[in-house]
Amino acid sequence: MKRRLFFSCCCLLFLMAGCDQGKPKEIDVKLHNASGDEVGTAKVAQQTSGVKITIKAEGFTPGPHGIHVHEIGECKAPSFESSGNHFNPDNKKHGLLNPKGAENGDLPNVVADGSGKIKAEIDAPHIKLEEGKTTIHRKDGASIIITENADDGMTQPTGKSGGRIACGVIVKKASDLKKK
């Protein structure tokens, strides 16, 4: 009798584990520079409110750099323009200092230390891995872009943050997933 109960409980746990196989709760992203070299990683993890993005990268000019989540999961070097604009399903204006609220993909600047290394943890409360309006699991996917200069938090449309110097695909475009 105990064996049957144990077996039944194991089967139930196995079935319940399969029910939570929807969207991932964490995504590892490889960051590449304009030459195609891997320069680091970003980990995007679902939290109670939004996501936490953990960046570990190197090879950057020391000082502050803008970082944003972009609306397309594609990183065609060298310009990374294929990643589109900032992720913005709430249709806000650019800038964390914007009094009417920022775009969903606007993030605080990251800082490269004297040796060009970036280590940062960023809370992104207006982005989700889970279902909903602000999910980055969409047909166009999403990407992370690091820019050559700091984002000033206000200037439209990109905060005077300069060119895109690193990119990583968080979620691929649906059309790219079908090609595999």
What function would you assign to each model-found segment?
Residues 1-7:
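Bacterial N-terminal signal peptides that target proteins for export
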Residues 11-12:
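Repetitive helical segments and hydrophobic/amphipathic motifs
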Residues 19-64, 69-180:
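N-terminal leader/targeting pre-sequences
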